[in-house]
Amino acid sequence: MPVDSFFYLLLLTGFCAGLMDAAVGGGGLLQIPGLFNLLPTSTPVASVMGVNKFASCCGTVTATGQYLRRIPVPWKMLLPAAVLAFAASYLGAKAVVFFPVQYMKPAMLVIMIAMCVYTFIKKDLGQTVRTEKLTRRETLWGLFFGALIGFYDGIFGPGTGSLLAFVFVRFYGYDFLTANASGKVINSTTNLAALTFFIPQGHVVWAWAILLALANLCGGVVGAKLAIRGGTQFLRYGFMVLLCLTIDKLGFDSITEGVQQAGFARRKRFRRPLYAKIRHLSASDR
Protein backbone atom coordinates (compact mmCIF):
# COMPACT_ATOMS: atom_id res chain seq x y z
CA MET A 1 0.00 0.00 0.00
CA PRO A 2 1.36 3.50 -0.90
CA VAL A 3 2.43 5.54 2.11
CA ASP A 4 0.01 8.39 1.29
CA SER A 5 -2.95 6.00 1.03
CA PHE A 6 -1.97 4.34 4.30
CA PHE A 7 -1.97 7.62 6.23
CA TYR A 8 -5.23 8.82 4.65
CA LEU A 9 -6.99 5.55 5.47
CA LEU A 10 -5.55 5.58 9.00
CA LEU A 11 -6.88 9.10 9.55
CA LEU A 12 -10.28 8.19 8.10
CA THR A 13 -10.52 5.08 10.29
CA GLY A 14 -9.60 7.06 13.40
CA PHE A 15 -12.06 9.85 12.67
CA CYS A 16 -15.01 7.53 11.95
CA ALA A 17 -14.26 5.36 15.00
CA GLY A 18 -13.97 8.43 17.24
CA LEU A 19 -17.25 9.83 15.92
CA MET A 20 -19.07 6.54 16.43
CA ASP A 21 -17.62 5.97 19.89
CA ALA A 22 -18.49 9.48 21.10
CA ALA A 23 -22.02 9.39 19.71
CA VAL A 24 -23.22 5.91 20.68
CA GLY A 25 -20.12 3.90 21.66
CA GLY A 26 -18.54 0.90 20.00
CA GLY A 27 -15.78 2.67 18.12
CA GLY A 28 -13.55 -0.35 18.66
CA LEU A 29 -15.86 -2.43 16.44
CA LEU A 30 -14.68 -0.22 13.57
CA GLN A 31 -11.17 0.77 14.63
CA ILE A 32 -9.68 -2.59 15.61
CA PRO A 33 -10.56 -4.43 12.34
CA GLY A 34 -9.39 -1.33 10.44
CA LEU A 35 -6.00 -1.43 12.15
CA PHE A 36 -5.55 -5.14 11.50
CA ASN A 37 -6.20 -4.48 7.80
CA LEU A 38 -4.05 -1.33 7.52
CA LEU A 39 -0.98 -2.04 9.66
CA PRO A 40 1.78 -4.37 8.39
CA THR A 41 1.03 -8.04 8.91
CA SER A 42 4.23 -8.36 10.94
CA THR A 43 2.83 -6.00 13.61
CA PRO A 44 2.32 -7.89 16.91
CA VAL A 45 -1.26 -8.11 18.14
CA ALA A 46 -0.28 -6.40 21.40
CA SER A 47 1.05 -3.42 19.43
CA VAL A 48 -2.16 -3.18 17.41
CA MET A 49 -4.17 -3.17 20.63
CA GLY A 50 -1.81 -0.64 22.21
CA VAL A 51 -2.18 1.76 19.27
CA ASN A 52 -5.96 1.31 19.38
CA LYS A 53 -6.17 1.89 23.12
CA PHE A 54 -4.03 5.07 23.02
CA ALA A 55 -6.14 6.58 20.23
CA SER A 56 -9.41 5.51 21.87
CA CYS A 57 -8.33 7.02 25.17
CA CYS A 58 -7.63 10.40 23.54
CA GLY A 59 -10.96 10.34 21.71
CA THR A 60 -12.95 9.26 24.76
CA VAL A 61 -11.41 11.90 27.04
CA THR A 62 -12.14 14.61 24.46
CA ALA A 63 -15.73 13.44 23.98
CA THR A 64 -16.17 13.28 27.76
CA GLY A 65 -15.11 16.93 28.01
CA GLN A 66 -17.69 17.89 25.38
CA TYR A 67 -20.46 16.10 27.28
CA LEU A 68 -19.52 17.50 30.68
CA ARG A 69 -19.72 21.08 29.41
CA ARG A 70 -23.43 20.65 28.72
CA ILE A 71 -24.70 17.62 30.65
CA PRO A 72 -24.77 17.47 34.49
CA VAL A 73 -23.64 14.10 35.85
CA PRO A 74 -23.78 12.53 39.36
CA TRP A 75 -20.20 13.26 40.43
CA LYS A 76 -20.74 12.01 43.99
CA MET A 77 -21.19 8.50 42.66
CA LEU A 78 -19.07 8.74 39.50
CA LEU A 79 -15.75 9.76 41.05
CA PRO A 80 -15.36 6.82 43.47
CA ALA A 81 -16.83 4.46 40.86
CA ALA A 82 -14.26 5.69 38.32
CA VAL A 83 -11.41 5.11 40.78
CA LEU A 84 -12.57 1.55 41.42
CA ALA A 85 -13.07 0.99 37.68
CA PHE A 86 -9.48 2.14 37.05
CA ALA A 87 -8.06 -0.31 39.60
CA ALA A 88 -10.33 -3.16 38.48
CA SER A 89 -9.49 -2.61 34.81
CA TYR A 90 -5.77 -2.83 35.54
CA LEU A 91 -6.30 -6.02 37.55
CA GLY A 92 -8.40 -7.41 34.71
CA ALA A 93 -5.60 -6.80 32.21
CA LYS A 94 -3.20 -8.60 34.54
CA ALA A 95 -5.64 -11.50 35.03
CA VAL A 96 -6.09 -12.26 31.33
CA VAL A 97 -3.49 -15.05 31.42
CA PHE A 98 -5.30 -16.80 34.30
CA PHE A 99 -8.91 -16.37 33.16
CA PRO A 100 -10.66 -18.55 30.53
CA VAL A 101 -11.59 -15.63 28.26
CA GLN A 102 -13.07 -17.95 25.61
CA TYR A 103 -16.14 -18.40 27.82
CA MET A 104 -16.77 -14.65 27.94
CA LYS A 105 -18.02 -14.35 24.37
CA PRO A 106 -21.03 -16.71 24.68
CA ALA A 107 -21.93 -15.16 28.06
CA MET A 108 -21.71 -11.62 26.69
CA LEU A 109 -23.71 -12.65 23.63
CA VAL A 110 -26.61 -13.72 25.88
CA ILE A 111 -26.36 -10.52 27.95
CA MET A 112 -26.31 -8.28 24.86
CA ILE A 113 -29.33 -10.04 23.35
CA ALA A 114 -31.24 -9.62 26.62
CA MET A 115 -30.31 -5.92 26.74
CA CYS A 116 -31.41 -5.42 23.14
CA VAL A 117 -34.77 -7.14 23.67
CA TYR A 118 -35.40 -5.23 26.91
CA THR A 119 -34.57 -1.87 25.31
CA PHE A 120 -36.81 -2.65 22.33
CA ILE A 121 -39.77 -3.62 24.54
CA LYS A 122 -39.39 -0.68 26.95
CA LYS A 123 -40.18 2.16 24.56
CA ASP A 124 -39.83 4.80 27.28
CA LEU A 125 -36.48 3.50 28.54
CA GLY A 126 -33.98 6.33 28.77
CA GLN A 127 -36.43 9.00 27.65
CA THR A 128 -37.16 10.71 30.97
CA VAL A 129 -34.80 13.08 32.79
CA ARG A 130 -34.13 12.15 36.42
CA THR A 131 -34.28 15.09 38.83
CA GLU A 132 -34.05 13.47 42.30
CA LYS A 133 -30.69 12.91 43.98
CA LEU A 134 -29.07 9.51 44.29
CA THR A 135 -29.66 7.56 47.48
CA ARG A 136 -26.82 6.11 49.53
CA ARG A 137 -27.75 2.63 48.38
CA GLU A 138 -27.63 3.68 44.71
CA THR A 139 -24.21 5.23 45.26
CA LEU A 140 -22.89 2.00 46.78
CA TRP A 141 -24.30 0.00 43.88
CA GLY A 142 -22.50 2.43 41.57
CA LEU A 143 -19.20 1.45 43.16
CA PHE A 144 -20.02 -2.21 42.58
CA PHE A 145 -20.98 -1.66 38.93
CA GLY A 146 -17.87 0.48 38.36
CA ALA A 147 -15.56 -2.22 39.70
CA LEU A 148 -17.37 -5.04 37.88
CA ILE A 149 -17.49 -3.35 34.47
CA GLY A 150 -13.95 -2.02 34.92
CA PHE A 151 -12.66 -5.55 35.50
CA TYR A 152 -14.61 -6.77 32.47
CA ASP A 153 -13.11 -4.01 30.31
CA GLY A 154 -9.61 -4.97 31.38
CA ILE A 155 -10.01 -8.69 30.84
CA PHE A 156 -12.21 -8.71 27.70
CA GLY A 157 -13.57 -5.33 26.57
CA PRO A 158 -16.21 -5.48 23.80
CA GLY A 159 -19.51 -3.85 24.77
CA THR A 160 -18.19 -1.93 27.78
CA GLY A 161 -19.82 1.33 26.67
CA SER A 162 -23.13 -0.44 26.09
CA LEU A 163 -23.03 -2.03 29.55
CA LEU A 164 -22.33 1.31 31.22
CA ALA A 165 -25.11 3.09 29.34
CA PHE A 166 -27.60 0.31 30.11
CA VAL A 167 -26.74 0.34 33.83
CA PHE A 168 -27.29 4.10 34.11
CA VAL A 169 -30.55 3.95 32.15
CA ARG A 170 -32.06 0.77 33.61
CA PHE A 171 -30.95 0.89 37.25
CA TYR A 172 -30.67 4.64 37.82
CA GLY A 173 -33.46 5.94 35.61
CA TYR A 174 -31.30 8.41 33.67
CA ASP A 175 -32.01 9.49 30.13
CA PHE A 176 -29.68 8.23 27.41
CA LEU A 177 -27.84 11.54 27.16
CA THR A 178 -26.94 11.63 30.87
CA ALA A 179 -26.18 7.90 30.81
CA ASN A 180 -23.85 8.36 27.85
CA ALA A 181 -22.02 11.24 29.54
CA SER A 182 -21.70 9.31 32.82
CA GLY A 183 -20.51 6.18 31.06
CA LYS A 184 -17.84 8.17 29.22
CA VAL A 185 -16.35 9.31 32.55
CA ILE A 186 -15.86 5.72 33.73
CA ASN A 187 -14.79 4.50 30.29
CA SER A 188 -12.07 7.15 30.19
CA THR A 189 -10.57 5.82 33.41
CA THR A 190 -10.63 2.19 32.22
CA ASN A 191 -8.85 3.23 29.01
CA LEU A 192 -6.21 5.05 31.06
CA ALA A 193 -5.75 1.95 33.19
CA ALA A 194 -5.14 -0.14 30.08
CA LEU A 195 -2.52 2.35 28.91
CA THR A 196 -0.61 1.97 32.17
CA PHE A 197 -0.25 -1.66 31.09
CA PHE A 198 0.48 -1.19 27.36
CA ILE A 199 2.93 1.74 27.51
CA PRO A 200 5.49 0.30 29.98
CA GLN A 201 5.47 -2.94 27.97
CA GLY A 202 6.41 -1.01 24.81
CA HIS A 203 3.23 -2.00 22.96
CA VAL A 204 2.41 1.50 21.65
CA VAL A 205 3.92 2.40 18.25
CA TRP A 206 3.94 6.16 18.70
CA ALA A 207 4.13 7.20 15.03
CA TRP A 208 0.86 5.43 14.28
CA ALA A 209 -0.74 6.01 17.67
CA ILE A 210 -0.36 9.81 17.67
CA LEU A 211 -1.71 10.15 14.13
CA LEU A 212 -4.66 7.89 14.89
CA ALA A 213 -5.28 9.71 18.17
CA LEU A 214 -5.52 13.10 16.43
CA ALA A 215 -8.13 11.73 14.04
CA ASN A 216 -9.97 10.00 16.89
CA LEU A 217 -9.95 13.22 18.87
CA CYS A 218 -11.54 15.17 16.00
CA GLY A 219 -14.13 12.46 15.51
CA GLY A 220 -14.88 12.49 19.23
CA VAL A 221 -15.67 16.21 19.18
CA VAL A 222 -18.00 15.85 16.19
CA GLY A 223 -19.68 12.71 17.59
CA ALA A 224 -20.35 14.26 20.99
CA LYS A 225 -21.88 17.36 19.41
CA LEU A 226 -24.09 15.20 17.18
CA ALA A 227 -25.28 13.18 20.18
CA ILE A 228 -26.03 16.29 22.26
CA ARG A 229 -27.90 17.87 19.37
CA GLY A 230 -29.78 14.66 18.51
CA GLY A 231 -30.92 14.11 22.10
CA THR A 232 -32.19 10.99 23.84
CA GLN A 233 -34.22 9.62 20.93
CA PHE A 234 -31.19 9.70 18.63
CA LEU A 235 -29.09 7.97 21.29
CA ARG A 236 -31.74 5.30 21.87
CA TYR A 237 -31.72 4.34 18.19
CA GLY A 238 -27.93 4.49 18.13
CA PHE A 239 -27.77 2.30 21.23
CA MET A 240 -29.99 -0.30 19.56
CA VAL A 241 -27.84 -0.31 16.42
CA LEU A 242 -24.69 -0.67 18.51
CA LEU A 243 -26.15 -3.62 20.43
CA CYS A 244 -27.04 -5.33 17.14
CA LEU A 245 -23.50 -4.80 15.79
CA THR A 246 -21.97 -6.15 19.00
CA ILE A 247 -24.31 -9.17 18.95
CA ASP A 248 -23.37 -9.82 15.32
CA LYS A 249 -19.63 -9.69 16.10
CA LEU A 250 -19.82 -11.84 19.24
CA GLY A 251 -22.09 -14.34 17.50
CA PHE A 252 -19.80 -14.62 14.47
CA ASP A 253 -16.72 -15.02 16.67
CA SER A 254 -18.40 -17.67 18.85
CA ILE A 255 -19.57 -19.69 15.83
CA THR A 256 -16.18 -19.43 14.10
CA GLU A 257 -14.27 -20.52 17.20
CA GLY A 258 -16.75 -23.35 17.82
CA VAL A 259 -16.35 -24.67 14.27
CA GLN A 260 -12.56 -24.49 14.52
CA GLN A 261 -12.52 -26.33 17.85
CA ALA A 262 -14.93 -28.98 16.55
CA GLY A 263 -12.78 -29.48 13.45
CA PHE A 264 -9.63 -29.84 15.55
CA ALA A 265 -11.31 -32.33 17.89
CA ARG A 266 -12.60 -34.34 14.94
CA ARG A 267 -9.18 -34.50 13.29
CA LYS A 268 -7.63 -35.51 16.59
CA ARG A 269 -10.25 -38.23 17.14
CA PHE A 270 -9.76 -39.79 13.70
CA ARG A 271 -5.98 -39.59 13.68
CA ARG A 272 -5.46 -41.79 16.73
CA PRO A 273 -7.05 -45.01 15.37
CA LEU A 274 -5.19 -44.58 12.07
CA TYR A 275 -1.89 -44.02 13.85
CA ALA A 276 -2.50 -47.05 16.06
CA LYS A 277 -3.36 -49.16 13.00
CA ILE A 278 -0.15 -48.17 11.23
CA ARG A 279 1.90 -49.07 14.30
CA HIS A 280 0.09 -52.43 14.49
CA LEU A 281 0.80 -53.21 10.82
CA SER A 282 4.42 -52.21 11.23
CA ALA A 283 4.78 -54.50 14.21
CA SER A 284 3.20 -57.39 12.24
CA ASP A 285 5.65 -56.94 9.37
CA ARG A 286 8.55 -57.25 11.74
Which residues fall in each region the model found?
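Small-residue hotspots at the loop-to-helix junctions and early N-terminal turns
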Residues: 45-49, 180-184
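N-terminal, intrinsically disordered charge-dense segments
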Residues: 282-286
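Selective hydrophobic functional segments
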Residues: 50-103, 107, 191-238, 269
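Residues within membrane-spanning alpha-helices of integral membrane proteins
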Residues: 7, 53, 109-112, 116, ...
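Selected transmembrane alpha-helices and immediately adjacent juxtamembrane segments
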Residues: 1-43, 129-180, 267-269, 274-276
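Transmembrane helix exit motif
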Residues: 62-72, 93, 101, 109-134, ...
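Residue-level signature of the transmembrane alpha-helical core
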Residues: 11, 15, 19, 53, ...
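Hydrophobic alpha-helical transmembrane segments in multi-pass integral membrane proteins
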Residues: 148-156, 194-199, 246-258
